[in-house]
Amino acid sequence: MIEIVYQEATILAMENDKVVGKIEFSLADIEMSILHTYAYESGRGIGSLLMQAAVEWAGEHKYTIVPICTFAQKYLEKK
């Protein structure tokens, strides 16, 4: 089972104590800029799981997401 872990400027996807993906972001004013999305195993939905976590975190903390990386852009276009 994949666990989401929030750290400063990073959201990690962990499985069996191993990082299987991460999002790197920056915060400024009311904006959360998604800089990079990494999923170390493709086809498992890890990137989407991370983006879902980022969207939820941004909403809870009243940030607007600015998708810098192409994965974040494509994910948000679908929503």
Where are these regions (language model features)?
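Active-site rim helix/loop that mediates acceptor-substrate recognition in acyltransferases
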Residues: 1-10
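Residue-level signal for tight coil/turn positions that link beta-strands
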Residues: 8, 27-29
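Conserved beta-hairpin
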Residues: 9-20
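A short, internal acetyl-CoA/4′-phosphopantetheine-binding micro-motif in the GNAT/acyltransferase core
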Residues: 36-43
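Conserved acetyl-CoA-binding loop-helix of GNAT-fold acetyltransferases
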Residues: 44-56
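Conserved GNAT acetyl-CoA-binding A-motif
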Residues: 57-71
